[in-house]
């Protein structure tokens, strides 16, 4: 029977889903304690829906995720996706930076096959740990034919998300992941997958970014978080460290103080690419109080600062033309 089942490649990177603690009733634990074999051993029912080919890419807390692992993960995922024997790829990942890794993969992988990222909010030794069921659901989504050509997906807490929209919204709740601007793309319940919408922004096979043309390190892009009474000091420090681009997590509709705005304009005139995003959890950034064309700024649409940074890093490998980069933010 197993020979007739689809083959899913499981790439493990660590995180809470692979974490372990001493006391099941306490919140303290260490991420990345369990290897991929131990994860699979805890879910024997996976063998009823797929043949799992597991590999360990890294075993870290996702606060330590970096470009080097991104490239290693993406290259291995692409190799597996190009293998006709593999139906899809599932990636276990810590939740802290999951949305950034997922968006990077959504822009650089080229395949119509399902790619699903999954994590957990409670470590494997916790009371009512959520990782095992989340992983079972992620594999269920990956083996479903309707999951093809939807770009990279995130599965958490019975819910299927497009990676462009998904964001972590709570530090501890298992329902932390939300798509605040557009809603979830579908749901999964004990293996039954349902979709309600189709991604419209460019992803995977439509993307102009290719792993074969990229190299690490990517162009340096910083995020500057603004606040009342903000001065340009941190922004200037970013420029002094040779940032090629800066994403501004502005207040409200991506706004900044008058003094900060002047510093941004001067940097833009020197060739630094400035993207205005927002520290607000939802909504888009538009040219309202700030005339972005006149200042030479780019608006992030409704991409949050961390995803805007990923897109800008990749965009800068292609061009420094601000009009073209603005188009990318409207297309991806």
Swiss-Prot record:
Q: Which reaction does it catalyse?
A: L-asparagine + H2O = L-aspartate + NH4(+)
All disulfide bonds of the chain are none
Query: Looking at the UniProt record for this protein, which Gene Ontology cellular component terms does it annotate, in alphabetical order?
Result: cytoplasm
**PROSITE patterns per UniProt:** ASN_GLN_ASE_1, ASN_GLN_ASE_2, ASN_GLN_ASE_3
One GO BP annotation is:
asparagine metabolic process
Q: What is its EC number?
A: 3.5.1.1
Recorded hits in NCBIfam families, A to Z, give: asnASE_II
**Lineage of source species:** Bacteria, Pseudomonadati, Campylobacterota, Epsilonproteobacteria, Campylobacterales
This chain belongs to the protein called: Probable L-asparaginase
| Source organism of this protein record | Helicobacter pylori (strain J99 / ATCC 700824)
Q: Which residues bind substrate?
A: 62, 95-96
Q: Does the keyword Magnesium apply?
A: no
Q: Where is it localised?
A: Cytoplasm
Where does it primarily localize? cytoplasm
Catalytic site positions: 16
Which family is this sequence assigned to?
Belongs to the asparaginase 1 family.
């Amino acid at each position: 029977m197993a020979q007739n089942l689809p083959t899913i490649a499981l790439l493990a990177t660590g995180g809470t889903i692979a974490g372990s603690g001493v006391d099941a009733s306490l919140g303290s634990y260490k991420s990345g304690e369990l290897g991929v074999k131990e994860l699979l051993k805890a879910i024997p029912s996976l063998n009823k829906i797929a043949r799992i080919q597991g590999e360990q890419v890294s075993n870290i807390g996702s606060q330590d995720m970096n470009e080097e692992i991104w490239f290693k993960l993406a290259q291995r995922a692409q190799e597996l996706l190009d293998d006709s024997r593999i139906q899809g790829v599932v990636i276990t990942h810590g939740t802290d930076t999951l949305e950034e890794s997922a968006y990077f993969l959504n822009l650089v992988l080229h395949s119509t096959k399902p790619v699903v990222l999954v994590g957990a909010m409670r470590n494997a030794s916790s009371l009512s740990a959520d990782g095992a069921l989340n992983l079972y659901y992620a594999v269920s989504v990956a083996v479903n034919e309707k999951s093809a050509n939807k770009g990279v997906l995130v599965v958490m807490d019975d819910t299927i998300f497009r990676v462009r929209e998904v964001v972590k919204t709570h530090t501890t709740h298992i329902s932390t992941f939300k798509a605040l601007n557009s809603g979830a793309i579908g749901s999964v319940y004990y293996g039954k997958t349902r979709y309600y919408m189709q991604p419209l922004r460019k992803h995977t096979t439509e993307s102009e970014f290719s792993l074969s043309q990229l190299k690490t390190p990517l162009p340096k892009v910083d995020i500057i978080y603004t606040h009342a009474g903000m001065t340009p000091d941190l922004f200037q420090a970013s420029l002094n460290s040779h940032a090629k681009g800066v994403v501004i997590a502005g207040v409200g509709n991506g706004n900044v103080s008058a003094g900060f705005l002047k510093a941004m304009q001067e940097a833009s005139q020197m060739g630094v690419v400035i993207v205005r995003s927002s520290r607000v959890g939802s909504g888009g950034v538009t040219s309202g109080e700030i005339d972005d064309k006149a200042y030479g700024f780019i608006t992030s649409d409704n991409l949050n600062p961390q995803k805007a940074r990923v897109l800008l890093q990749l965009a800068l490998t292609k061009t420094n033309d601000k009009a073209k980069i603005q188009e990318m933010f409207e297309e991806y």
